[in-house]
Amino acid sequence: MTAPALKNDRYLRALAKQPVDRTPVWMMRQAGRYLPEYKEVRGQAGDFMSLCRNTELACEVTMQPLRRFDLDAAILFSDILTIPDAMGLGLYFEAGEGPKFKDPVRSMAAIKNLAVPDMEDELGYVMDAVRAIRRELNGSVPLIGFSGSPWTLATYMVEGGSTKNFSKVKQLMFADPEAMHTLLNVLAESVTQYLNAQIAAGAQSVMIFDTWGGVLSPRDYKAFSLAYMEKIVAGLTREADGRKVPVTLFTKNGGQWLEAMAASGADALGVDWTTDLSDARARVGGQVALQGNMDPSVLYAKPARIEEEVQSILQSYGSGTGHVFNLGHGIHPEVDPEHAAAFIEAIHKYSPAFHSND
């Protein structure tokens, strides 16, 4: 079956640093708890992973923000912990405490028992969702697939859930670096296969979320996080539907490492609000596109203040292509959807002036 032609390719064009008429925008966690319609579907599903595993419902929540807002991309509704879950670690969610694993891995013996999951068997529900979303989108906007980075997945797998001080994962990293590298290798192979399976199923762009890379020292970041993302980028399918499949790397609090990240082979880097976009562009704008970078907490402000922040970020990046507007991290559940609408409308209103010479 031939895929329908893409009606809006603004997002893919910006990632390729090709001319655009306005700055494309999507929001991390755009399908989520801030939307009343999401809460309704989430209630039907029962629990979060049941929602991820239900093709029809995962497709529905992916589409919800696109019906409400004029966005330039859809992102697969899923979770970064699907891979460790498929490895049999017993993922569960505890109210108010986030994800937890019944069987964390903290020794070489436990790590050696891990296998790369079968992408069309244990993770087939993700690929089914990608295919369903592509059908539903019908060429309206591109679909982004994603995964957590090996380091970020490892933090959850070793800690057994969320953590504030990363003591267990850092203990493994320093006390038994060989075990840590063994774990990161199996995760890098898993993520490569996982993203390639998403691309084969129809994802037109992919993103690697390195949520916890920013807790490492520069030396450890390069050895335990970036090296494995580079490995993934090198192993990805880079063309589908007759066009390039761009890859974006995002390390939260990773602004100091943009040069090293830009040398990874990625097409774009996500930037959070702790880095100035003009600074990021001066440093790596010649090599990669940039995505970001409004603090999601600005969405608590009145629409006039949101509009002011959007203008400030557009001015910071400056004129020309190569910028995808986004938040610097996921949208907060308490945000008023009308404030998200004001954010998107402000980008539509003010960004064309920055592209008059594209």
UniProtKB/Swiss-Prot annotation:
Pathway: Porphyrin-containing compound metabolism; protoporphyrin-IX biosynthesis; coproporphyrinogen-III from 5-aminolevulinate: step 4/4. Substrate binds at residues 29-33, 79, 156, 211, 329. GO terms for biological process: protoporphyrinogen IX biosynthetic process from glutamate. Belongs to the uroporphyrinogen decarboxylase family. It catalyses: uroporphyrinogen III + 4 H(+) = coproporphyrinogen III + 4 CO2. PROSITE patterns: UROD_1 (PS00906), UROD_2 (PS00907). One of its GO terms (cellular component) is cytosol. Its EC number is 4.1.1.37. GO terms for molecular function: uroporphyrinogen decarboxylase activity. This is Uroporphyrinogen decarboxylase. It holds the Pfam family URO-D. Keywords: Cytoplasm, Decarboxylase, Lyase, Porphyrin biosynthesis. PANTHER family: METHYLTETRAHYDROFOLATE:HOMOCYSTEINE METHYLTRANSFERASE RELATED, UROPORPHYRINOGEN DECARBOXYLASE.
